């Protein structure tokens, strides 16, 4: 009955005084829990981890602290329960520090294992840029390898043009310097057979022109010869005609002279 009377009297207080008292007791309880947790976890975990753990425990147990303070206000004479609750909080803080230390050690071991795997592994994502840069080669390397990508640089282009002129695909080599005098001269390839009209129709234009060059020249020569022969024939005919005319004139002259002599006699 006395407890019920005390609870009724407490409910009659204004809300502002209740909140003020609750805040004071919450601050005192949080200070005590921080002291106990720091003393218990100083042997296992360094200082920065203690602060994090204490903040987590205080954030998790705010509702429990409020309930305990209400119970303590209702029973002002009974402070043993608060000490028991603080003991529970200290044990919980020790467990959390132990778990956090074990988790940190596991994480460190995992990091070490990952580093070891990266050292022994063939695939390294951090070296992607270097691998890509190795694909780009100069003009000379790309020409020697026959593959790979070529990065454009004005210096490389200038050196390429200086080293390889436009007619570098048709090099002029003097084989006499490296030719052994005891070696026989290489034989010429066999002469290709003459192509007929049907076969020549399937050959390219430049091949046809090279093959038909001599017949054209021969035909032109034949035409010139025919023209010359015609001219000679005309000249011979003219000379023969003149000779015949001269002979006819001589015959007439002789005949007329004979007749004239016969008439006089």
Swiss-Prot record:
Applications (biotechnology): Used in cell biology research to transform T-cell lymphocytes. Saimiriine herpesvirus 2 transforms T-cell lymphocytes, including human, to continuous growth in vitro. 2 viral proteins, Tip and StpC, are essential for this function.
| Sequence ranges on the Cytoplasmic membrane side | 1-238
Composition bias (Basic and acidic residues) maps to 15-26
User: Extracellular face: residue ranges?
Assistant: 260-265
| Biased composition annotated in UniProt, kind: Low complexity | 27-43
Q: What else is known?
A: In its host, LCK protein is inactivated, preventing T-cell transformation activity.
Q: What is this protein called?
A: Tyrosine protein kinase-interacting protein
Classification from the root reads: Viruses, Duplodnaviria, Heunggongvirae, Peploviricota, Herviviricetes
């Amino acid at each position: 009955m006395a407890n019920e009377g005390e609870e009724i009297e407490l409910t009659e207080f204004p809300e502002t005084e209740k909140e003020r008292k609750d805040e004071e007791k919450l601050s005192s309880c949080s200070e005590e829990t921080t002291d106990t947790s720091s003393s218990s976890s100083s042997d296992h975990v360094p200082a920065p981890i203690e602060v994090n753990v204490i903040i987590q425990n205080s954030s998790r147990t705010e509702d429990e602290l409020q309930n305990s303070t209400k119970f303590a206000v209702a029973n002002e004479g009974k402070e043993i329960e608060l000490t028991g609750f603080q003991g529970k909080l200290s044990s919980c803080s020790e467990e959390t520090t132990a778990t956090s230390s074990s988790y940190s050690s596991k994480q460190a071991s995992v990091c070490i294992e990952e580093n070891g795997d990266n050292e022994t592994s063939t695939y390294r994502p951090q070296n992607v840029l270097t691998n890509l840069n190795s694909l780009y080669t100069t003009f000379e390397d790309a020409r020697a390898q026959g593959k790979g990508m070529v990065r454009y640089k004005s210096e490389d282009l200038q050196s390429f043009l200086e080293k390889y002129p436009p007619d570098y695909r048709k090099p002029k080599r003097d084989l006499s310097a490296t030719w052994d005098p005891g070696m026989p001269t290489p034989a010429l390839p066999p002469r290709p057979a003459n192509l007929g009209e049907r076969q020549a129709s399937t050959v390219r234009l430049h091949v046809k022109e090279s093959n038909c060059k001599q017949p054209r020249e021969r035909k032109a020569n034949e035409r010139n010869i025919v023209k010359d022969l015609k001219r000679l024939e005309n000249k011979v005919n003219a000379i023969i005609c003149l000779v015949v005319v001269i002979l006819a004139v001589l015959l007439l002259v002789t005949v007329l002279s004979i007749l004239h002599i016969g008439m006089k006699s």
